[in-house]
A protein has these predicted regions:
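Cytosolic regulatory/linker segments at or just downstream of nucleotide-handling modules
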Residues: 127-129, 155-203
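Conserved nucleotide-binding and Mg2+-coordinating catalytic segments in signaling enzymes
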Residues: 4, 8, 25, 29-35
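Regulatory cytosolic signal-relay segments
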Residues: 1-22, 48
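Catalytic core of nucleotidyl cyclases, primarily class III adenylyl/guanylyl cyclases
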Residues: 24, 29, 60-93, 105-144, ...
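Catalytic/regulatory signature loops of cyclic-dinucleotide turnover enzymes
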Residues: 105-111, 123-124, 144-169
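Conserved long alpha-helical elements within nucleotide-processing catalytic cores of c-di-GMP signaling
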Residues: 22, 35-58, 62, 67-71
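A generic structural signal for short hydrophobic patches within well-formed alpha-helices
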Residues: 7, 34, 72, 77, ...
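Hydrophobic alpha-helical membrane-association signature
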Residues: 46-53, 94-97, 101, 144-148
Length: 203
């Protein structure tokens, strides 16, 4: 993902491009179990299956107005909502997106007799985006919401959809949650909440 406005500034020769975003939801999602599942498969088949999952994730992102920023090396993805297109309901959109990711994984498991799962961490707050690097320029995100979303995602090894206090407070009347511990951040301790959702992925 590189917004067209950023790409245009880059093509015009502008350097040190960055933008402050006051309120954005950030999603870290990691697919669990794919490496073990694909170990016995021919490489072409495993790549094809992974591509089908990534394509389904991208289609889900488009449906929910979520922006896929980049794929991660550990079969994960970093995404945002409200970054390129400001959205008042960015928190609830990310929850709906995360739920659909779990459903996609569940269908994959049914079709391929697999035992994959997904772990998602979400936070909302200020984000800075910009181009970094000289020889290999990439569009990157940093800031409080990016850091905390990653901490929430990494707070447990279990599958599930985990959110920060800010996301919980924004959607608590819409979705049910269970307390799932705490993580440390720059301001101290942050509660983590797990979305109560019936899905077909192993815990």
């Amino acid at each position: 993902l590189m917004p067209e406005t950023v790409a245009r500034r880059y093509r015009e020769g502008e350097e040190n491009i960055s933008t402050q975003h006051r309120d954005v939801s950030v999603i870290y999602a990691q697919l669990l179990g794919f490496e073990a599942f694909s170990r016995s498969l021919p490489s072409e088949e495993s790549v094809s299956m992974l591509n089908s999952l990534v394509e389904a994730f991208d289609e889900a992102a488009e449906r929910h107005g979520v922006e896929h920023v980049r794929s991660m090396q550990d079969t994960g993805l970093l995404a945002t909502c409200g970054l390129v297109v400001p959205r008042i309901d960015h928190a609830s959109r990310t929850i709906a997106f995360a739920k659909e990711l779990a459903q996609i994984v569940g269908r994959f498991n049914d079709q391929h007799d697999a035992g994959l799962a997904i772990r998602v961490g979400i936070d909302s707050g200020p984000v800075t985006s910009g181009l970094v690097g000289e020889r290999s320029t990439i569009y990157a995100l940093w800031g409080e919401a990016v850091d905390l979303a990653h901490r929430v995602h990494a707070a447990t090894k279990s599958a599930g959809i985990f959110v920060s206090d800010r996301v919980h407070d924004a959607v608590v009347g819409i979705y049910p949650f269970t307390a799932a511990g705490t993580v440390s951040d720059a301001a101290g301790t942050e509660r983590v909440w797990r979305l109560d959702v019936a899905n077909r992925q192993p815990a």
